[in-house]
Amino acid sequence: PDNLCVTPRGALLINEDNDSSNPQRMVGMDMDGRTFAFAESNVVLAGERGFTGDFRYEEWCGVCFSADGRWLFANCYAPGFTVAITGPWANGPL
């Protein structure tokens, strides 16, 4: 893994950084140690805002929750952008 984040409820989010031909993922680990796919990079840009390319294989990095635990922020290494993800977190293991 590239980095990880402890969620407000004590679970983990693990960011992949591998050299495989698969899209990079964020993997969750619940309080019992079970892992599950949480998010997968699916970023392909066709010139929007000046960026073109297939970025599915670029790593997630710098994942963290807002202070109130309502928003998860994650960065995509290339082309370099941040996403904000909201729950409902209480409905799942994170």
Question: What do these predicted regions represent?
Answer:
Residues 1-94:
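Sequence/structural signature of beta-propeller domains
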